[in-house]
Amino acid sequence: MKYIIGIAVLMLTACSSVPDKAYYQLPDVYQGANNKVVTTTESAKQDQIWVQPIRLSDMLVNTGIVYQTSDINYTVANQHLWINPLDQQLQQNLVVGLAKEFPNRVVSTQPIEDKLAKLTVNVNYFQGRYDGKVIIAGDWIYTQGNKVISQPFSVVLTQTQDGYPALVRTLGEGWQNVVAEIAKTIKSQY
């Protein structure tokens, strides 16, 4: 009898399925952007913006997409994961977006010269929310010479469809808004 029960349990567990993991990357909102190649001799003549690594709050430093389930509860998805670390995706989108906005400057993740502008971005919230909203918030600091610009940012967008793919697309749109606002503020000051 124990043998039959064991086989039945084994058969039932073999038939159950574990949901597949889905991997996501922020959309390439800058497709077709002018991604010029700058040689070393040309870059020495242009001002540089050094985009430092994005700093994420602790809840965002994981592979799962963060979702706020109530006014005080958060969950990190186990089946819906970032294909590449979120900080790297955000930094790459920021570099490409700023390069588009500043075509006469070198925008890079590495310092190329001693005289450069430095951009540091902290992301505290980058998630979907129970009411269909997408929240992106944090702050950034831009230093160039003796001048320092420090600004918070907060973007709240409505997710137009259900599901993680729509959430990731809306997060990408929100990040594009943050990049545009950073570029606009820098341009207005210099």
Q: For each predicted feature, which ranges?
A:
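C-terminal/domain-edge helix-coil "capping" segments
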Residues: D20-Y23, P27, Q31-V38, Q161-Y190
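Soluble periplasmic/extracytoplasmic beta-strand elements of cell-envelope proteins
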Residues: Q48-P53, V66, K118-V123, I135-D139, ...
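Sec-dependent signal peptide recognition
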Residues: M1-A8
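C-terminal motif of bacterial Sec signal peptides marking the signal peptidase cleavage site
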Residues: L12-A14
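Surface-exposed short loop/turn segments
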Residues: S17-N34, K100-N146
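N-terminal secretory signal peptides
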Residues: G32-Q52
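N-terminal segment of the mature soluble domain
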Residues: Q46-K115
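Short secondary-structure boundary motifs at beta->alpha junctions and helix caps
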Residues: N73-L81, K147-N177
